């Protein structure tokens, strides 16, 4: 895959521990390296979001999540594969394979394989990313780059410009173990 210069620049910022904003399927997101504790805590502070709530991890391809999915039953893997890539976020048992600053106080972690081309490109360059809506707690999610800049001014390390994916609502969230819908689309 030949990556765009802007995606390469954003990926470098992420690899260096930065927090970026980027367009997702329905709203603008904030992202960083999930294994970089300082970056994740900075992102949480920008949003005024408690670490206990946990965060979503987004990937370009299901194989980027193999470290997390490798011991799951085949029926669960088939369920995931049948809904990805796409606007389906699943709560998956993390088995302590991700740090607590990503999972919060939960035994599962929210994961999604995106179908947004720019987010896929970014994840191919960086590996899985944190993906959370670009808004301070209690405010509506940003649907424009201007709103991102109004919310966060110069507190971000980068903004990857591009178009939203055209969906009206954030992704559906379901529990992989129970099948329960946690957040409707």
From Swiss-Prot:
It is found in: Cytoplasm. Its EC number is 2.7.7.87. Keywords: ATP-binding, Cytoplasm, Nucleotide-binding, Nucleotidyltransferase, Transferase, tRNA processing. It is an enzyme of class 2 (transferase). The keyword Cytoplasm applies. PROSITE patterns: YRDC. The keyword Cell membrane does not apply. Residues 4-185 form the YrdC-like domain. It catalyses: L-threonine + hydrogencarbonate + ATP = L-threonylcarbamoyladenylate + diphosphate + H2O. HAMAP family: TsaC (MF_01852). Required for the formation of a threonylcarbamoyl group on adenosine at position 37 (t(6)A37) in tRNAs that read codons beginning with adenine. Catalyzes the conversion of L-threonine, HCO(3)(-)/CO(2) and ATP to give threonylcarbamoyl-AMP (TC-AMP) as the acyladenylate intermediate, with the release of diphosphate. This is Threonylcarbamoyl-AMP synthase. It comes from Pseudomonas paraeruginosa (strain DSM 24068 / PA7).
